[in-house]
């Protein structure tokens, strides 16, 4: 039946996306999009549009990805981690298009949903990166430090290493080479020579 094909298409696309397998063309996820539609709020409809957007994003069609992410947000019936992920991906699209204020807005929306949870570090890091892109180094440092504090509390070593690297870059751009060296050294200790 059509419902089974739509669910299969959605779950297979979701599994590929989660495992970083290229989504290829949109024919598979389009089956789910057509079945679930874009009128009635449901998690499956939101996910179908999200993954359709991810397929577009993978191909470099940012404006189409943005449209699908916005549709997914509209269709999402609950405020949960998945909604935060949609906002986070939408923010990345806006960041790519240099729409920095809108990117920060969406990272903040993701953060508001994730506040107090382990995943809150990701939108904070996004906010910091956008501030750095705008050459607002002090704001970037503030958000990178907030993200680092969360990653340290969660003992997420891969994220801690990445944030040490991020902080080293900001301090280097500020020409504070002593602080930059301190964070590079911490990153190397944690991640080995690959950190540089």
State where each predicted segment sits.
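A "functional boundary" signal
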Residues: 1-196
């Amino acid at each position: 039946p059509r419902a089974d094909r739509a669910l299969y298409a959605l779950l297979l696309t979701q599994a590929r996306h989660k495992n970083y397998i290229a989504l290829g063309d949109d024919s598979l996820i389009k089956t789910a999009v057509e079945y679930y539609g874009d009128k009635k709020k449901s998690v499956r409809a939101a996910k179908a549009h999200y993954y359709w957007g991810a397929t577009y994003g993978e191909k470099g069609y940012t404006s189409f990805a943005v449209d699908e992410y916005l549709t997914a947000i509209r269709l999402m019936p609950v405020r949960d981690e998945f909604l935060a992920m949609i906002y986070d991906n939408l923010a990345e699209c806006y960041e790519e298009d240099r729409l920095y204020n809108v990117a920060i807005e969406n990272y903040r929306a993701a953060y508001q949903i994730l506040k107090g949870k382990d995943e809150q570090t990701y939108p904070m890091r996004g906010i910091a990166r956008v501030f750095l892109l705008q050459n607002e180094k002090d704001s970037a440092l503030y958000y990178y430090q907030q993200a680092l504090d969360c990653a340290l509390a969660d003992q997420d070593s891969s994220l801690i290493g990445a944030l040490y690297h991020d902080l080293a870059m900001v301090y280097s751009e500020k020409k504070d080479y002593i602080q930059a060296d301190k964070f590079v050294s911490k990153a190397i200790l944690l991640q080995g020579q690959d950190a540089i």
